[in-house]
A protein has these predicted regions:
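N-terminal secretory signal peptides that target proteins for export/translocation
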Residues: 1-7
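N-terminal acidic, proline/glycine-rich, low-complexity intrinsically disordered segments
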Residues: 2, 20-29
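Bacterial N-terminal signal peptides
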Residues: 10-20
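Short S/T/G/P-rich N-terminal loop/turn motif that feeds into the first structured element of a domain
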Residues: 25-279
Length: 279
């Protein structure tokens, strides 16, 4: 259970970094754009936020091969993907609390049609001989690798200070939740009516929810609260700080019969193994 939960938690953190920053950039661009004449008839979905999909690969690395695996990412994979036109690749890992030697790698999915291509961007760029060499070295380094398709739930998220940040927060408290079948709508309503107001009042860096659509728990949601230090985390839950002990107890009671299980961990962004279009 803990290994599965960590995978789901990591997925949410990865998605949060790309989705929230992307939306922040889009919002800033929209504010700077000149005003356009109002359309005669507005299209129903004209202002809808496009879905944010990401490909996430969870890799368990052999303890004695961590350095070799990291070198492959820095010297082979990242340069090749940049050359292939991939704009972003983010890597995350456990921050003290969780399993060691696990890494989560994320790249945005621009279109699902990309998976209809017979060759991956990495294979195309490296060529057959270099790609086979990379595969052989990678197999010697890893225990397992599992890829997911995740959907960001921006309608259940609060961007907070993410809009003005130039990079990802250092840490995140990530909570994996399994919802009671048939209670998903109740959970989402509670997030909108009760959770988001608390996060805004607590002035958190950002709060994010995602769903794993392919390869994960069909009833699973994952929430992330961002922090810049363990000292900030040590100040206590935003719900306790905003609502007080009695208010927090009443708040959590609302989730009885809605949340079947939850598990919490802390994760951090690894800048040395990541790249973005700005770099």
């Amino acid at each position: 259970m803990k290994r599965t939960a960590w995978r789901v938690l990591s997925l949410a953190l990865c998605l949060a970094m790309t989705a929230l920053i992307a939306v922040a950039q889009n919002t800033t661009a929209a504010k700077a754009a000149p005003k356009k004449p109002a359309a005669q008839k507005a299209k129903p979905m004209a202002d809808a936020q496009p879905q944010q999909w990401s490909s996430i690969t969870v890799v368990r690395v052999k303890p004695d091969m961590v350095t070799e695996w990291q070198d492959l990412q820095k010297k082979v994979v990242n340069p090749a993907l940049k050359k292939a036109g991939v704009k972003e690749r983010s890597v995350f890992e456990t921050a003290v609390f969780g399993e060691s030697y696990e890494y989560v790698v994320i790249t945005p999915i621009t279109s699902f049609a990309q998976y209809d291509e017979p060759m991956s961007p990495l294979r195309k760029t490296l060529g057959e001989d270099a790609f086979r060499d990379y595969q052989a070295k990678s197999r010697r380094c890893i225990v397992s690798s599992h890829t997911f398709g995740d959907l960001a739930r921006l309608d259940l998220s609060y961007m907070g200070k993410m809009m003005t940040m130039t990079g990802p927060p250092k840490l995140a408290v990530v909570n994996s939740l399994s919802i009671v079948p048939g209670r998903a709508a109740a959970f989402e309503n509670l997030v909108k009516s009760d959770v988001l107001p608390v996060m805004k009042k607590a002035d958190v860096i950002g709060y994010f929810i995602s769903q794993t659509m392919f390869g994960g728990d069909g009833y699973g949601y994952t929430s992330v609260v961002f922090y810049d230090s363990f000292a900030e985390i040590g100040k206590g839950s935003p719900f306790l700080r905003v609502l007080g002990p009695a208010g927090a107890a009443a708040f959590f009671a609302k989730f009885a019969g809605v949340v079947a299980h939850q598990e919490r961990t802390i994760a951090r962004f690894n800048p040395d193994l990541s790249f973005s279009a700005a770099q």
